[in-house]
Curated annotation (Swiss-Prot):
This is Large ribosomal subunit protein uL14. It comes from Streptococcus sanguinis (strain SK36). SMART domains: Ribosomal_L14 (SM01374). The keyword Ligase does not apply. The lineage of its organism: Bacteria, Bacillati, Bacillota, Bacilli, Lactobacillales. Belongs to the universal ribosomal protein uL14 family. Part of the 50S ribosomal subunit. Forms a cluster with proteins L3 and L19. In the 70S ribosome, L14 and L19 interact and together make contacts with the 16S rRNA in bridges B5 and B8.
């Protein structure tokens, strides 16, 4: 579960390396975000020459969480880190590559471009 002030690794080549969650989108007073949810975040670390700079406020979708997610068949999926992909308003990624595996739950949220760019979908 991701909440306000949570730091996440960025799993794309948009130029950001680490982001800090400002707000969880999707309902008033929503506290936690899980895999496939959209957040508003601030860039805390960035690579030089990237499209995204330190201090930029961006939207991102969560692709991996340590707490994991429960699937309809009763199984759980967990990852070793919390990670997100920076997106545009039309749910397409800002970067051109995705690093590491992503969860199958992104397909249900309409993030097909992220699923197709990912090297592995679990």
């Amino acid at each position: 579960m991701i909440q306000t002030e949570t730091r996440l690794k960025v799993a794309d080549n948009s130029g950001a390396r680490e982001i800090l969650t400002i707000k969880v989108l999707g309902g008033s007073g929503r506290k936690f975000a899980n895999i496939g949810d959209v957040i508003v975040a601030s860039v805390k670390q960035a690579t030089p020459g990237g499209a995204v700079k330190k201090g930029d406020v961006v939207k991102a979708v969560i692709v991996r969480t340590k707490s994991g997610a429960r699937r309809k068949d009763g199984s759980y999926i967990k990852f070793d880190e919390n990670a997100a992909v920076i997106i545009r308003e039309d749910k397409t990624p800002r970067g051109t590559r995705i690093f590491g595996p992503v969860a199958r739950e992104l397909r249900d949220g309409g993030f097909m471009k992220i699923v197709s760019l990912a090297p592995e979908v679990l």
